Amino acid sequence: MRTLCAVIAGVIGLGVGVSGAGAAPSGREAPVVDQADLIGASLQVGETVFGKFLASRYAESVGDFAAAASFAAQLMAENPDLKDIARRGHMLMASAGRIAEAAELAEQVVAGNERDPLANMTLTARAFAREDYREALKRLDKIELTGIQRIIVPLMRAWALAGDGRTDAALVLLEDLTATNALLGPITGLHGGLIADLSGRPEAADAAFTRGIAASGESVSLQMVEAYAGLLARSNQHEKAVRLVEAFTLTNPRTLLIEPVRTALAEGKVPEPVVTGFADGAAESLHAVANQLYRERLRAQALIMIQLALHLRPESPATLFLLGQILEREEQLETAMEAYGGIDTSTPYGWYARLNLADGYRTQDHLDKAVRLLRAMIRERPERSDAARALGDFLRIDERYREAVSAYDTAFERSADAADWRLFYTRGIALERAKKWERAERDLLKALELEPDQPLVLNYLGYSWIEQGHNLDRAKKMIEKAVLQRPQDGYIADSLGWALYRLGNYPEAVINLERAVALEPGDPIINDHLGDAYWLAGRREEARFQWTRSLSQEPEPKVEDIIRDKLKGKQLPQPVPAKQRRDI
């Protein structure tokens, strides 16, 4: 929920107990490893253990928690008394989804530090799985309410109280939580309604859901709509449930996720409940917090929370989908694809998971597999445009431009949104590359009409006009506008330099093309452009150097032939006639 995101941004002290003091150079959260751990490992057990320790650390540093956990398991099996290995091993096992093993290690951790937040949260999840709600409450009592724990602990405590038969106490706890921070109204309303509904108190559930919706403003969550619509349908308020779902659909017209509820109501049935037990409620709490940690780019913490949620609801499509998203961001594509592959394809999340699987196949250079999957999806749901659009993107990137145009045409036929500049832009690119300029120009102009200041459109259309020698003054102004918006984009800088070159302003062209090469040093076209500008600026040796450099960067065969001719003194750049030159 939007409001929960705002709250988390304000209270996070990285209090899950697994965050580092800073970020790794790549932007990924740095793994938590004290230097003393490393030195201690070396001194205590020698090089074999040291190697496994380093292997575990390296796997963790690149986000491969499964491998890191395996190395840590070997290390612990051989050296159970190694200093602090239980804490590290517990974190890695939880990150890898090996919750049973993580819980065993958590027992060791709390034996040395009974207030360790992550270990106690893992043991709380295990207690919920065992329906031991008093044990869950005991573990939650040990967690200090700092950072994100100020949200997740009260939510989990409410569910444990409800599981222990203390529904009134659970609902009061959630009301008190709202009183401390009104922005938590949506999530406390949702969970209060779920607890009351599950405990057989429909009137209290209705009141809680109503408060939650009021607190949500225009950002009512899917879970809220699903849960409240189900309650209304069971309470013989079918029409009110339908209106609730219709209102959500109006503000979220493209989503499939509401489809099961909408279909059930259309058939006069009661939608499936959001939760069927108290462990489900705990999982829902963990999932909500994991989702917002992920949005805040705190992926290491999000991964542990979602793995705990998955332990409580192993086949949850929503949980598996979020797990896949987090793993993708951690560059663990194969593991992410396993998560996506575990989602029932008949569910709405199964549709989105297959879109992500197709993208994964493309990334793995299995484009044919991605294309087959997307074509099957296009046939499966003839009313949807997203699979056709993805197919167009994949084919365009693979330079299969005519096929890409066909896929984009299908997407347009199915799209309810005629004001999507991105679709006009991407089809315009494919059309231009397929040498269908008239259609391409119409699409690019339409994209520009819809998004007048969009730098990508300004640059592409402007560059295309320059290449054709059309509308040069307007093209230059468009590209200058794009440069102002994206000054660090080497391709846009190249477009401006090339525009100046085509206008005969070689000194200014050189300045801008040198900047473009500095931003994108490995692009053969930009280096070739700079070579041409150097040549006409009278800097012949530098021109030859740039052309030679361009050849080393494996340009397309046609471009390569032109560059080789220039190096042989053939087809050399020719200056623009003086009468056609324009000042900047």
Predicted regions and their residues:
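N-terminal leader/linker segments that initiate helical-solenoid repeat arrays
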Residues: A21-G89, S95-E104, E114-L118, K138, ...
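Residue-level recognition of tetratricopeptide repeat
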Residues: R57, M91, A125, W159, ...
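Register position in tetratricopeptide repeats
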Residues: S61, S95, A129-R130, G163-D164, ...
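Structural marker of alpha-solenoid helical repeat scaffolds
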Residues: E78, A111-N113, L145-T146, A179-N181, ...
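TPR alpha-solenoid repeat register
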Residues: I85, A119, V153, I187-T188, ...
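Canonical tetratricopeptide repeat
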Residues: R88-G89, T122, M156, H191, ...
